[in-house]
């Protein structure tokens, strides 16, 4: 944790959730008041549920976000969704550059940067994801990979108000594996140094989230690490009890 930076616990539902999932979201809304003093809460459901969830969340302690956007505001892009459309549906933040988008759809740093700028254009926060693969880690390339992703994916003009960085080691996502606390501290410290060097005072205030098999049993330990300002939670965010328990793990 970093003094004076309010933690953010963001849930990425990925390609999960139908109308019936509103019951879990309702439970999150009902329990949010108990953790509101510890952290901000954000849930990013599939695009099909954003409007319904945003309506439910109005005036409550849980914000609603999106998992991706197209860089353009409109046009002949069948199946894509503009940041403006997501904001219009009620999203207040958009995840961009998630490793699954980078791997499954071949998204590179330049496109991720454009998507972050699109989020800003729509008046919402960009959550930019970075992370190394197992092969890159084994080759000792972690910091070089992260430096390249940070340099290429973060737009000029990034501030603590419009951008969040999420570090997700690709090898830890959905595997049950997590880096050691020492590894997390080293990498988040490296990210903080990069952000402060490039964005000065704002870089020192930006939230840096940890993601990758975050669960109630390890949340408190991870959230206590210096320069960890919250979590990007995958599978555990699908259950209200787990999601809220992770938030309770914040100092």
From Swiss-Prot:
GO biological process, any: glycolytic process
Source organism of the structure: Bradyrhizobium diazoefficiens (strain JCM 10833 / BCRC 13528 / IAM 13628 / NBRC 14792 / USDA 110)
Gene name of the encoded protein: tpiA
Function as written in the Swiss-Prot or TrEMBL entry: Involved in the gluconeogenesis. Catalyzes stereospecifically the conversion of dihydroxyacetone phosphate (DHAP) to D-glyceraldehyde-3-phosphate (G3P).
Catalytic activity: D-glyceraldehyde 3-phosphate = dihydroxyacetone phosphate
EC numbers on record: 5.3.1.1
UniProt keywords, alphabetically: Cytoplasm, Gluconeogenesis, Glycolysis, Isomerase
One GO CC term on file: cytosol
Pfam family, one: TIM
Family from the record: Belongs to the triosephosphate isomerase family.
Compartments where found: Cytoplasm
Broad class of where this protein is predominantly found: cytoplasm
Complex formation: Homodimer.
GO MF annotations in UniProt: triose-phosphate isomerase activity
Binding site for substrate: 12-14, 174, 213, 234-235
The name this protein goes by in its record: Triosephosphate isomerase
Top enzyme category: isomerase
InterPro entries: Aldolase_TIM, TIM_sf, TrioseP_Isoase_bac/euk, Triosephosphate_isomerase, Triosephosphate_isomerase_AS
Positions annotated as active site in the UniProt record: 98, 168
Functional pathway: Carbohydrate biosynthesis; gluconeogenesis; Carbohydrate degradation; glycolysis; D-glyceraldehyde 3-phosphate from glycerone phosphate: step 1/1
Sections of the chain in a coiled coil: none
